[in-house]
Amino acid sequence: MREYKLVVLGSGGVGKSALTVQFVQGIFVEKYDPTIEDSYRKQVEVDGQQCMLEILDTAGTEQFTAMRDLYMKNGQGFALVYSITAQSTFNDLQDLREQILRVKDTDDVPMILVGNKCDLEDERVVGKEQGQNLARQWNSCAFLESSAKSKINVNEIFYDLVRQINRKTPVTGKPRKKSTCQLL
């Protein structure tokens, strides 16, 4: 079974943990409890293929920056999350993306831009078109709006990253084990 290392990044309070826990455990976490770093594993089926996802839920961008290079280096796919209710969280993502590309030393990194908390439409300050435009600027990066609370597009975030990783590095046929027979 193929393993995928996915990393969820963004400013504090955008709902990174809420999205991750909703995806992995099917629970909405109401209380805000700042994360240092949590790792989750979940087996899923994407396009008929069994996958083991290892999801790293990270601290907000303003905290624990020293750890960031390491998980950017090891991550295969990245969800860059902002809150549609806070413009500053959207603005923070450009630097984060540039850091990922610098650490990975390539422009071709599986990535999805996520506008979270879309259930709070009456508190929206970041328009959907702003997210779409930024995703286009980022080499046609995938874009979704989501809500961990209302379970909108939660699974799609992680499945999309798996599909991007599969397109970038497809699994070839399983290498056959070479067996040798020795007669003594």
Swiss-Prot record:
PROSITE patterns: RAS
Placement of sequence motif Effector region: 32-40
The protein's Enzyme Commission number: 3.6.5.2
Keywords: Cell junction, Cell membrane, Cytoplasm, GTP-binding, Hydrolase, Lipoprotein, Membrane, Methylation, Nucleotide-binding, Prenylation
Family annotation (SUPFAM superfamilies): P-loop containing nucleoside triphosphate hydrolases
Gene3D superfamilies, per database record: P-loop containing nucleotide triphosphate hydrolases
GO cellular component terms listed in the entry, alphabetical order: cell-cell junction; cytosol; plasma membrane
Catalytic reaction annotation: GTP + H2O = GDP + phosphate + H(+)
One BP annotation, GO: somite rostral/caudal axis specification
Keyword rRNA-binding annotated: no
Name used for this protein in its record: Ras-related protein Rap-1b
Phylogenetic classification of the source organism: Eukaryota, Metazoa, Chordata, Craniata, Vertebrata
Gene: rap1b
